Each structure stands twice: as C-alpha cells, then as structure tokens.
Amino acid sequence: VLSASDKSNVKAAFGKIGGQAGDLGGQALERMFITYPQTKTYFPHFDLSHGSAQIKGHGKKVAEALVEAANHIDDIAGALSKLSDLHAQKLRVDPVNFKLLGHCFLVVVAAHFPSLLTPEVHASLDKFVLAVGTVLTAKYR
C-alpha cells in the first residue's frame, strides 16, 4: 500500500522524469531483454537489436502507462483497467515479468537521475512499480 509520503515521492519523481519517460521506458525494456533474455519470448516479431524502433516504441507505451498510473495514483486500477484487461485476456504475460521490467525501469532512472533516487524515493518508486504490476495481473485467472 502506498502511503501519502510514497504518493508524494512518486508524483515528484515523475514530475522530474516525465519528459524523458519514453526514452527511459525504451532503455528499461532493452535492459530487461539483455538481463533477462527469457522475456524476449513475448516479442518474437520485434527487432530486438540495440536502439530498435520497436523497442523504443513499446518502451514509450510502458512509460506512458507508468505516467498515467502516477497521474492517477489514488486509482491506479481504474487508470490501467483497459491495459490490465489486455494483459490478462490477450497477452497473458507471465506476472514475474512486470517485476523484472519495473526493476529495470528503476535502474535506468537511477542511471539518469542519481540524485533523485534517495533511499526514500527509491523505496516509494519500488512500491509504485510493484503496485502497477499487481494491477496489471489482477485480472489473471
């Protein structure tokens, strides 16, 4: 559960990274594919080479979903309801992959904004990406 302090930290962090979120999402996705190669199985039709337009494009979608969740932090489930349906009913992505991608996103944020990730903000962002992953897998059966 995100505390009031966590919510404030997440909103402030996304306020600082918001304009670069798309680039960060692409880098996080690429990092996930390199670090956890088993995650590539969900993207057999993608060009998975470094700097691929498909990775950047999907990474931007991931980042936009995170921004949307941050903008609606009091109702993440409502904000991501359609995306949750998509992942549960059509894509059927293994839930562990959301944790892996969330971790990679935090690593990329830390690399680009090292002073932003104080221990408190890091903990809040970690709880936030876990909350997003929980929402995205809530409709799995």
From Swiss-Prot:
Red blood cells. GO terms for molecular function: haptoglobin binding; heme binding; iron ion binding; organic acid binding; oxygen binding; oxygen carrier activity; peroxidase activity. CDD domains: Hb-alpha-like. Heme b binds at residue 87. Disulfide bonds: none annotated. InterPro entries: Globin (IPR000971), Globin-like_sf (IPR009050), Globin/Proto (IPR012292), Hemoglobin_a-typ (IPR002338), Hemoglobin_oxygen_transport (IPR050056), Hemoglobin_pi (IPR002339). It holds the Pfam family Globin. PANTHER family: HEMOGLOBIN FAMILY MEMBER, HEMOGLOBIN SUBUNIT ALPHA. This is Hemoglobin subunit alpha-A. It comes from Streptopelia orientalis.
